[in-house]
Amino acid sequence: MHLARLFIFVSLFSSVSTFSQQESYYYNFWNVQQYYLPALTGIENKHEAVVLARDQWIGLNGRPRTINVQYAQKLEKINSGIGFIYQVQKIGYSQVQKAKLSYAYHLKLGEKQLLSFGTNVGLNFLKFKADWVPPTTEPDPSLPSEKLQTNFSADFGVNYKHSNWQIGLGMTQLTNQRKTDSFTFTYARHYYLQSSYKFRFGEQMELTPRLLFQTDFVKIAATLNVQFKVNRWFQFGLAARNTEFLGANVGCYFLKKFYLGYSAQITFGPIMDLNKFYTHEAVLSFTIPN
């Protein structure tokens, strides 16, 4: 019932497109969900470390490139999870580095129910350096050439889990920044709604559909991702987004604690009229289960 409602919700926003981005649109979003849904910090494993690299729209000058590193640890004695996040993203002339600390509290509501609250706090470091080519030989003072900026950042999230189903709401970049000059870079608030359900077939096979809605109330992205775990060491999946995007992935588990995955995505619509741009993602994770 819950999944049916969410699939209907996807169709309502299937015609909405995105035009720009401050936050990355990950294909393997469940691997970095601590970033946008801090309530999930330390919720599944005793220890979990993830490195994810994303190269978006290969062939496009100034394309977005992102590296995300995160770690989480479960503190079962105090029903909590702690961790940290480091992200660096380059788009055009700008580079933004984000360093965050994560905390979540896990409230048990029953044998199979868990309600979690979490937050990320940290700093955003912006570096902007441009080499403009104006139409005249005279320098244009309205074009910024270089800027360094540091801002405090705070995120919040809440998540409910019942057996194999979970749903969560996350909010990033909650703090407002005051403009000190005409070139001040401000971070827009982003809101996330995520849900998933894990179907088990025997001891090894699993089918997990996931839905993620991401918006800053200017644009909306709705991503449907379906993962099929064939056995203890191999999985594959498909994904689609309302922003004219299709993708596929493969991944393998090895040495019992490691996962290595790769995904490729293709974008349709206006950007494809220029050229065939593809996006690649690679993820490596290490987990020690409960």
Predicted regions and their residues:
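Sec-dependent signal peptide recognition
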Residues: 2-9
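Hydrophobic alpha-helical membrane-interaction elements
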Residues: 11-13
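N-terminal signal peptide c-region/cleavage motif recognized by signal peptidases
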Residues: 15-17
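Subset of outer-membrane beta-barrel
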Residues: 21-290
